[in-house]
Amino acid sequence: MLWNSRNIALYAAVLCSTIPNSVALAQGVIEGGFLGDYTEGTDGGATAFQRRDTRIDFTWQEQGPGGAISPAFRTAGWSGFSGLWYGTVIPSTSETYTFTLSATDSAALYIRKTGTKAWTELIDDPTTGSKTDRKAMALVAGQPYDLSIHYTQHAKTGALQLGWSSPTVPQQVIDAATPLGINGSTPVINDQGTMFADAAKEARHFAGYSDTGVSIALDADGWPLSDATLPLWNVGLEMTGTYGVSFVGQAKLTDWNGLGSFWVDGKSYGTVLPVGVGYDAATNTTEAKWVVSATGTTAANIGFATTRRTAASAVGSGITNLKIMRPLAPGSTSTYATEVLFNARYTSLLSHFTGIRFMDYLAIPGNKLQTWSERARPGDATQDQLVSSWGWEGKGGALEYLVALANETGKDVWINVPLYADDDYVTRLARLLAYGSDGTNPYTSRQADPTYPALNGNLKIYVEYSNELWNPLYPQQAENEALAVAEVEAGGSPLNYDGETSHTIWAQRRVVDRTRRISDLFRAVWGDSGMMSRVRPVFEWQYANANNTAAVGLTYLENYYGNADGKPHVSTARSANYYLWGGGAGWYVTSNAPTASSVAAILAAGQTNPSTEGDTIWAEAFGLHEMGYEGGFEVGGDTPSALQLLANRAAAAEDAETNAIDRFFQLGGGYPFVFNAAGNTAYGIASPTINEQSTPKMAAILKAISATRPVQDFAFPIPATVPLSFDMGVHPSGKTTGTLTHIGDYLAWTVSVATPGTFTVTTNAATPSNLTIIIDGKPVAKGSWTGALTAGLHGIRVRNLSAAGTALSQLIVTQ
C-alpha cells in the first residue's frame, strides 16, 4: 500500500542511426483478451478448460497449454490439443490492416463486424510446420470486430501468434486495447480475497490443542507432531455452506466455536466428530463434511485430539496433509475437489484484468527473506507463515502457486523481489519462471512433466525491487538506507562514485542499482532475446519525481553505467532502457472533500488528478514505458471511517473510478494496476469480500476494458518549436534553468506525433554539436537528427557534452 499522502561524449559512443518504435495509438483486443476453449486431442470433445488469454503469442513446451496443477490445467500428458479463441478488437485508425497468423500446425482466422452473424474467412491453413499467413482487410476506426481463431496441434510442442499491422501501425502482437492490472490478495488468515479453494492454505500455524496461544512442535512442513488446534479464521466474513475436511491419519475433531456440524455418510455428529469416524484404514485418511450454518462475527478454530499419523503411530502424534475445501459459493452444499487449487470467485475477478501484481502475495513490505531456503514452499501446511520481527504478512506465498495462478487465469505477472534477497534467490526465481520447480528448487532446463510448471509462454514478467523504498512509513525505507550506508562504508561501491555524501542519495541510488543487478541476473537466465520481450524490469518512484526519486535513480544509472558524465566508469556503456523496461509511480486519486459530512458531499466535490503526467515525462525521457503500480479512486486511505467506506461503495464511485482510469491514460500512462482485489477497505474492488463483485468500482473497470483507452492529451504536438517551459523539469537538478552546466546534464520534452513520418530534431543552442540528441532513451546523433517517428508519444532528450556548459531555450522539430 502507498504512503497516505497521495495528493501529493563516452555516452555518445553508443549512438544509433534509428530509433525503436514508440507505442502506437490505443488499439487492440477488448475485455482483457481472447476467451479460449482448450480440448485434449485433435478430434474434438469436451472442453478441458477455458481461459481468457491476455494475448495469443504462445510457444508451447512439453508441459502443454495448461501450466498448473489443478486437474483441468494439468496438461503435460496431452499428446496434442485443439484451441478455439474468441475476442473483439477495435482499431484506432481507418485504414487497411494486415492480420498475421504464425503457427506450427493447422490454424484459421475468421472475422465479422460485431453485431453481425456471418463470419468472413481471412486465413485457413491446414498444413503443418512453421509458417506465417497474412491477410489484409480495411477496418474502420472505433468499429469493433469479432475474431475467431482455430488451432489444432498434433504434437506436444508448438507455437501460435496473432498479430496485425497497418501503414501507420508497426507489426505487433494484438494486445489489450486497455491494459489494466490488479494488485492481488494476500494468502493470510482473514484476507477477503480467499484465493485458495483450500481454506487451510490461509490458516495460521497449528497451535496448542486447548490454548492457541501456546506454540507446539511442528515438522519441517508445518504439520503438528501432537494434538493441536488450527486457527482457521478470526473474523466472521468467511462463507457459510459445506466445507470438505480431509487429512492423513486419525483424530477427534472439535468445532470449538460451534459454527456448524460435522457430517459423515449422511449422519450429523454435531460439533464433535469422534475419532475413527470417516477414517479409511486402507488409505490412512479421514474425510468428513463440515456444514457451517452461520459464521457471524466469531472465529473458527478446529481441534484435533487423540491424533495418530498412522495406524502404528502413538496416540498424540499429530496429522498431516489437512485440506478444508471451501463451498463453491456462499451457502453451497457442494465443495471444491481436493486437487483444485484456486477459489473460482477469485479467478473470476482476475479474469477481467491483463496482469496481476503480487506485492502483497509475496509479503514485500515486511519480508526480510535473504536466501532461497527461507521462502514459503507449496508443500507447506499453510501459506500464512509468520516470522518474528517480519511484517504481518509473514513470508508470503509460494512462487509455484503464483505461477499457477497466472497460468490458470492467463495473466501477466508483476513480481517484487524482497529487500534483502541475495543474488542466488534472484537467479532461482528467474529459473523457476522459465523452467518450473520440483517444489523445492527450480529446474535448470525445460522438463517434460514438471512438478510445478513454468510460466506460460505468452505471459510477460514485470520485475520490481521491493516496494516503495522511498516511503518512510515502511520499515524497509530505513533498512534500504542502512544497506546503502554499509555498502559505501565497505568500499568499492558505485553509490558514491562522484563523492556524494548524502545517505538519502545513496539509498535512492541503491534502489535502481539493485534493480539493474536483478535485470542482469534475469538476463543470464533468459538471454538477451528474453529481456524486454518477456522479462521487463521496472523502476518505480514517488509520485511525479517527488523528492527527486526518479531523477536521482535514472541519472545515476546513466551517469555511472552509461558513462554519461564523460568518465569511463564501465567498459561497456548502456542506456537506462537496456536494464529497465518500465518506470512510474502510483496513480491514486481521491475526493476533493474526503472528510465531508455525507457520502453525497464527498462524491460531489470532484476529485484530484493522478500524478501520471509527471511520471510519464520521466519514463518517456529515458525510453521507458510508464507503469502505474498501484492506484484508482479511493476515499479514506489506509484508515477509512465508516462514512468513507460507504463512499467507496456508493453508486457515484463508478464515475469516480472511471474518471481515475481515463485520466491515467489521458496523462500518458501506459499500464495501470488497480489496488486491490478485495477487502473491507477503501481499496477493495470486490468489497467487503470476494463474493461481492458487483460493486460500482468493478462496473467502472468493466466499462474501461470494453473499449479502447483514451488517447493522451498533454504532450506537445510536433512538428513545432517547443519552448523550454515545456521541458517539464526533466533534468537532474529538478529545476529549469536552460543552462546545462555539467557534462551529462540534460533536458527532456515529451512530444506527440499524430501522423508518422520523417522529422528533423535540433535545438537553438549556439553550438548544437555540444548536445547529444536522445530519442526514446537511445542516443541518435550530435546536434541534429533526421529520422522516422511513429505515431504516439516520444521522449526527446538533449544531453550536454561540453565541460564549458551549453545554453538553450528551444527544441526545434520540423517535418
Model segments located where?
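Edge beta-strands of jelly-roll/beta-sandwich modules across compartments, strongly enriched
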Residues: 155-164, 316-319, 804-813
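Short beta-strand-plus-loop segments that form exposed binding edges in beta-rich domains
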Residues: 148-157, 306-308, 797-805
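Extracellular carbohydrate recognition and processing domains
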Residues: 123-133, 279-289, 772-793
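Bacterial N-terminal signal peptides that target proteins for export
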Residues: 1-11
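Extracellular/secretory pathway-exposed regions associated with glycan biology
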Residues: 27-183, 719-742, 746
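Non-catalytic accessory regions flanking glycosidase/transglycosidase catalytic cores in CAZymes
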Residues: 181-465, 470-603, 609-635, 639-642, ...
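Short strand-turn-strand beta-turns centered on an Asx-Gly dipeptide
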Residues: 112-114, 265, 774-778
